[in-house]
Amino acid sequence: MLTPHNVMAAGEEAPSILLPAVYDIVWSAVVFVVLLVVIWKYALPRVYAMLDGRTEAIAGGIEKAERAQAEADAAKAELTAQLAEARAEAGRIREQARVDATAIAAEIKEQATADAARITASAQQQIEAERQQAVVSLRSEVGSLAIDLASGVIGQSLTDDQRSTALVDRFLADLEASETAGRTGSAS
């Protein structure tokens, strides 16, 4: 028997599940081509522009980073050179300070030695002057005492200046001679 289903099947082939109809393929191809043209014409240039912008930004960033790195390296080298120069200068200053300190110490020592020699010479001169003054004073006093004693022993006045001066000089010479003999005797 012939049923409508069988009639249709006899006149046409049944549609395939895997293969669509020809009109679907044509319309799908037309839509695909239209979409491809629209994307190619409008979207793709924007994507390329965006990618080019990103590429330029990345390249610019890399270039800036390389410049910054080069500047940092140059600054580091300059600072290292300045540091080495500063250390060398500090060493020179330290050495100059040592030399100056040695020279100043020598100068102060020389000045102190000269001052000590001057003070010693001045003190010796003062001592010698005071000794001479004491000798003169003692000679005068001893002379007076000797004349008074001699006047008392002799019983006559020794007012004659020449005689009294000669007597005093002889007495003092005897006194110095006995003192010198006492020193040489005690030294041996």
UniProtKB/Swiss-Prot annotation:
It holds the Pfam family ATP-synt_B. It comes from the Bacteria. Gene3D superfamilies: F1F0 ATP synthase subunit B, membrane domain. Disulfide bonds: none annotated. Keywords: ATP synthesis, Cell membrane, CF(0), Hydrogen ion transport, Ion transport, Membrane, Transmembrane, Transmembrane helix, Transport. One of its GO terms (molecular function) is proton-transporting ATP synthase activity, rotational mechanism. The chain crosses the membrane at residues 19-39. One of its GO terms (cellular component) is proton-transporting ATP synthase complex. It is a single-pass membrane protein. InterPro entries: ATP_synth_B-like_membr_sf, ATP_synth_b/b'su_bac/chlpt, ATP_synth_F0_bsu_bac, ATP_synthase_B_chain. It is found in: Cell membrane. F(1)F(0) ATP synthase produces ATP from ADP in the presence of a proton or sodium gradient. F-type ATPases consist of two structural domains, F(1) containing the extramembraneous catalytic core and F(0) containing the membrane proton channel, linked together by a central stalk and a peripheral stalk. During catalysis, ATP synthesis in the catalytic domain of F(1) is coupled via a rotary mechanism of the central stalk subunits to proton translocation. F-type ATPases have 2 components, F(1) - the catalytic core - and F(0) - the membrane proton channel. F(1) has five subunits: alpha(3), beta(3), gamma(1), delta(1), epsilon(1). F(0) has three main subunits: a(1), b(2) and c(10-14). The alpha and beta chains form an alternating ring which encloses part of the gamma chain. F(1) is attached to F(0) by a central stalk formed by the gamma and epsilon chains, while a peripheral stalk is formed by the delta and b chains. Belongs to the ATPase B chain family. This is ATP synthase subunit b. It comes from Clavibacter michiganensis subsp. michiganensis (strain NCPPB 382).
